[in-house]
């Protein structure tokens, strides 16, 4: 793993978010280029005895859902997301796009 990613993940978990033992940490990463950082964040959360919950969003897939989703579907998705977020103690979001 690139040492810069290790250093960034450690800083996010231990300094920025200050994850503590048994903290439930929602890690949301967007785009393929953010996977290495997400993986390292999981390791760092476990290292401080936190509990990671990882979610990946791929914008092109989301677009397909949103192009055809019903109002009811969107409301249910929002309710489910809200309930899960309410159960978390910490949130770390990572956004990235393909570098083409």
Regions found by a protein language model. Give the residues of each.
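Active-site bordering "gate/hinge" segments
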Residues: 1-100
């Amino acid at each position: 793993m690139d040492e810069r990613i290790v250093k960034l993940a450690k800083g996010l978990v231990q300094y920025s978010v200050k994850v503590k033992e048994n903290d439930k940490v929602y890690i949301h990463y967007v785009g393929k280029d953010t996977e290495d950082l997400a993986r390292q964040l999981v390791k760092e959360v476990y290292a401080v005895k936190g509990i990671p919950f990882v979610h990946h969003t791929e914008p092109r897939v989301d677009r397909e859902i949103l192009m055809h989703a019903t109002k009811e579907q969107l409301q249910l998705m929002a309710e489910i997301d809200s309930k899960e977020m309410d159960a978390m103690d910490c949130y770390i979001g990572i956004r990235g796009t393909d570098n083409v």
